[in-house]
Amino acid sequence: GFQKELLNRWRKISSRIEMVTTPTGLPLPRLALPQTDEPGDIARYLFGEGLPGEFPFVNSAYSEMYLAKSEIRPVLRSGTAEGGNPKSEIEEPTRLFAGLGLAEDTNRRFHYLTQQQKNIRLSTAFDGPTLYGLDSDSDGVLGKVGEGGVAIDTIEDMERLYAGFPLGDEHFSVSMTINGPAPAILAMYVAAAKRRFGSDIVPKLRGTIQADILKEVQAQNEIIFPLEASLRFLTDMVEFTTANLPRWYPISISGYHIAEAGATPVQQAAFTLSNGFTYVEIFRDRGLRVNRFGPRLSFFLDCGLEVEYLALARVCRKLWAVAMRDVFQADARAQRFKLHTQTSGRSLVAQEFKNNLTRTAVELLLACINATNSCHSNSADEAFTTPSQEFVRLAAQAQAIMLEETGLFKFMMNTFGGSPGMKIVERTVEEAVLAEFREIDRLGGVLAAIEHRYQRSQIQLAAHRYEQQINEGARPIIGLNRYRDEAEGLRPVKVIRTPRKKKHLQVERLQRFKRRHRDAAESALDELSEVVEHGGNEFAELIKTVEHCSLGQITARLHELVGHYRPAI
């Protein structure tokens, strides 16, 4: 009967698990499974959690992650639906976020960070003007040029940014953290790659662009066009990339900014997942097929010090898989919740800032316990400055120590999964996330909840509680409200700033570009206007537009066509 069949399957699975010997001589299985022959326990595990890489993906999105590659065979993953490209890498989570000064400054930082890596996974931070679609010569922005991220005005900046990297190589990928002007920035990347390698490079490009407009309205405030127009431009980009860039993730549905704005871990998960379901509905309404675009959706979560983070990503993987299978009838590849994690920026404290090294290490451990697909670990000095090279290196080495020096992840998968405490946290978090879903549904869905300012108001209330708890001492912050060194506040710290000379160099380059392309730019902008006004694909046209136009020129023309974002009051 069923019990006998289940036991036979379980024994077959167990017998196929490879054994490995650690340097100290300890024999371990490559995959930790519950030690039981009880059919009820086996059924609860196989159907409630699933084996790594199997529905509902609680333990991980893929069957092998972090394991020492010299001792196991690479996992070949199936190609994308309808003729996409196969992906054959075991997951390596290190993806470090960088962006400072001008394009060549960030390029040097990228080369420094990846000098000993086989798999080069860059993650790009942009400066304030770029994030808002402004040029470096726009009124009032000079002081922000190159601060907190890299200044990108033109396709020439984009060429400098990734110079010397093999853009089409299967071991290279890039992530871009940008939202409002994301289509123009990705168009610059595609056009710059074509300049350097020719048109054949386009289907080989691998990477991710954030482009999550819904969370901008809810938390980060970097939406620059009206919501309806922004969603249209996003869908144009998803439609184009799904057809022409099969290795590209055209959206990273992001809870990180929601959490950094003050949301609780449960709110982060609930708002991120509900935003994701809304995007699926929007893309399907355009006529896109879920099994085509679904595998190209990715996610980005915060990982802080709260106990919820012991199981938050596990819950998200399960709920996403169930909804994609049962509500949207998506296949297994679209059911996978592919996750990039960043350690918490909000948890970093300027007082006795070297304590941040410990905070980040603990958060990194939690992210790896949750089998994140990639991870950025913050630098200890980010609480008060653009990260310095010293602390960037320490952040990178923290990941190497976690994955290569310790034995927690490289010998055995699922080392921590299934503990009684984890199960309690997992169940409680899941129930709380579902309660948030019910409230959003009661309001009429995500877009209606945005009109009611529901997500924003809940985030603000949570942020207020968080700060109040710190002020009252109910939330201990070591070195700030507990065990404080009073002399620490008098010690000087090094603050990284972009020199004024470099800011002026960026402006001069931009103005030279505009002079060279003056006539061609006006014609290119008129052609873009024609496409937008007549319902064509804006992104396809942008790849041509960026050859002659700056980011600010494109943004200004689109503002003329669709207007500016105005929040509901």
Regions inferred by a protein language model and the residue ranges of each:
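Flexible, glycine-rich loop/tail regions that form catalytic "lids" or insertion modules at the edges
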Residues: 4-41, 48-61, 67-68, 74, ...
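Generic, well-ordered alpha-helical scaffold segments in large soluble proteins
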Residues: 109-116, 155-165, 188-196, 236-244, ...
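Short hydrophobic/aromatic segments of transmembrane alpha-helices and their interfaces
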Residues: 140-142, 261, 356-357, 404, ...
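Short secondary-structure transition/capping segments
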Residues: 134-137, 386-389, 461-462, 565-567
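Conserved active-site and cofactor/substrate-binding residues in soluble primary-metabolism enzymes
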Residues: 52, 101-105, 117, 153-156, ...
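A short glycine/serine-rich beta->alpha loop
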Residues: 172-178, 262-265, 348-352, 383-386, ...
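Active-site capping/gating regions of soluble enzymes
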Residues: 270-275, 279, 298-479
